[in-house]
Amino acid sequence: MTHPESERRAREVRRASAEAMNAYNATVPFNAWLGAEVVSADHEGVRLKVPWRVEFGGAPGMTHGGILAGIIDLSAYMALMAEKGGAGPTIDMRIDYHRSVVNGTLFTFAKLLRVGATISTVEVVVHDAEQRLIASGRCVFLSQGRKRAPDALPVDA
């Protein structure tokens, strides 16, 4: 289920600025909880900064993989928002975990690999403050506005 305010904001924003993306993130509860800040958005890609918190912990001495996956998914979505105002849902995501991190700010860089009529693909890397690779991922999104008509859904759905 989507948040009505976040849907409205996504429709309003095309080729969004970092400021507009941060305002959008404040309307999405999970994004706001992550505390990510879009620090730049340009033709090369989008950069986010995420201050580490104790709530990000998984096993002792490690950040929970779901947190890193969420940060990667958010970063990828922000890259699409910067280019075309948003995207549909994530339909595939692959994450590689390279190094554990227990504290300190995380930094992401997301770049568009392909923006198509039906799907879009974004590559994301996550680094720590020392530029060590923490995780990387690739997200595939259904293009915004491409929804099946309700009568086209299978009867069993």
Segments the model singles out, each with a brief description of its role:
Residues 1-157:
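Terminal targeting signals and extreme-terminal segments of soluble enzymes
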